[in-house]
Structures are given as C-alpha cells and as structure tokens.
Amino acid sequence: MKKLAFIKRSNGKHWVGDGFPVRSIFSYSDIAAEMSPFLLMDYAGPADFPPTERKLGVGQHPHRGFETVTIVYHGGVSHRDSSGGGGTIGPGDVQWMTAGSGLIHEEYHSPEFARTGGAFEMIQLWINLPAKHKMTAPGYQG
C-alpha cells in the first residue's frame, strides 16, 4: 500500500483574463517536486456566460519550455500563436500546444460560443519538457 504524500486544498477561484474563472488543482509553486513533470492544472468553470460580441479570454502572452493540454467540456476555445498554430476546440475536443523554444499565444472563447453564450467548462494541464527538448520548435494540435 502506498503512503499518502499530501492533501492539496484549493486556493479558491481566480480569473485568467476575463474569460476563464479558474480553480488551480495544483501549481508549480505548491507541489512541483511531487508532481514532476506536471507544472500546473487549472479547472475553469462551470460558469455561465451571456451572449456577447466582446472577445473574452486572455490576450497575447509568452510561454517557453513546456506543453499545454486543454480539454473543453462545455463551450468553445479559440487559440492562435506566433508559430502559425491555431484553431477552435469545442466539447470533447483536445488541444495540445508545444511552447518549446518559445511562442506568444492567445486564447479566447470561440466566436460561436461568444455569440450564443451558455455553460463553459474546461481543464488545462501544463507539462514540463525534458531539458533536451526545451528548445524544440513550437507546435499546435487541435
């Protein structure tokens, strides 16, 4: 039988940009040594958004040396990055972004979801790349 290493309690919800009300399941600063290679896991939602013409989400920001895996349960997310990657994912879809040597990206509610509004729910996991792969070319799969 394995011994329980720790119990992690949530630090509460916070907003990432103006479109993602998240609760950090774990983060690098909390339990990095115990969770390697996982850096962070954020759970967004469930939240209801009214229809809007505004772009809700998080604008351009840099990443380097890790990958993000995003799964949408309700709603839709559109991604665009400086390597030319991008796309829109909806319920049941997965997006995998490799930041590698570095990129700038943005994520917003998809235009379709913004127009209709409704329930939004997703999860995002950040995975540290091994040292020998940190300078790999950026990439996107969605």
Predicted feature residues:
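Conserved, well-structured core segments that form or line functional sites
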Residues: 121, 127-142
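Short, compositionally biased
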Residues: 108-120
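A short glycine-rich, His/Asp/Glu-containing loop-to-beta-strand
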Residues: 14-73, 122
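Short, Gly/Pro- and small/polar-rich lid/capping loops
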Residues: 1-12
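A short beta-strand-loop-beta hairpin characteristic of the jelly-roll/cupin
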Residues: 55, 69-91, 104-107
